Amino acid sequence: MRIWGLPMKGRGETGLYSFFRWIVVPLFGGVYRCRVKGTENLPDDGPVIVITNHKANLDPVIVAMFFDRPLRFMAKKELFGNAALRKFIVSLGAFPIDRGAGDRAALSTSLEILAGGEVLLMFPEGHRQRDDAVHEFLPGVGMLALRSGAPVLPVAMDGTQRMLRDGRPGLPALRALVGPPLDLSDLTGRNSKAYQEAARRMRDAVAGLYARL
């Protein structure tokens, strides 16, 4: 079982984090049938941007089940308005983003995470999608990849959208496929055209993996 929810770099382990690390995540993995392929592509160290399609709120947990390193991820700023909820999701590696505007603070935090050699999990579609398509990726993920120079690891997932079908808990099979890191080295520009092309390649990579699930 892989671990999710390690605290931010330099912070001590909290009781809440320990609870999720040793109890919740293992229980989750034991209840749901998870089939993961391509784990040999997961890097053991160094910065990496993990990109995947987004179907449910529990998607970060699914990635954490097969990723052996702490994950940091963006969450919509509205979730940080409540003090108790804010403390909870921050302890799991989340930081806020304003999805309705260009968020320089979120970009700065993301670059800092990658500069520190950490793992940044991103859902470049921007919102949860319930259909069977991988939608267009926002160009911001391309900008982040090119500005940071961090490897980009594509992942496709399916099944999480059926975990609460019609508001009732379900036990669907969860499938994930991890692809090899993308080569974006030919995109030397730092402009909107290059960022859009990088985002397009990322989307195509995830869509290709999704078609193989």
Where in the sequence are the language-model features?
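N-terminal membrane-anchoring alpha-helices
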Residues: M1-R33
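Catalytic core of membrane glycerolipid acyltransferases/transacylases, capturing the structured
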Residues: S18, W22, G29-G30, D44-A101, ...
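A short, flexible N-terminal coil/short beta segment enriched in small residues
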Residues: R2-L6, L42, A64-M65
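Residues at the C-termini of beta-strands that transition into short coil/loop
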Residues: E40, K77, D98, A156, ...
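Non-catalytic C-terminal accessory region of glycerolipid acyltransferases
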Residues: R2-G15, A105-L213
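Secondary-structure boundary/capping positions in well-ordered alpha/beta enzyme cores
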Residues: C34, R69-P70, F95, G117, ...
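A short, well-structured juxtamembrane/interface segment
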Residues: V25-G46, L184
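Structural motif corresponding to alpha-helix initiation and N-cap regions
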Residues: V36-T39, N82, R104-L107
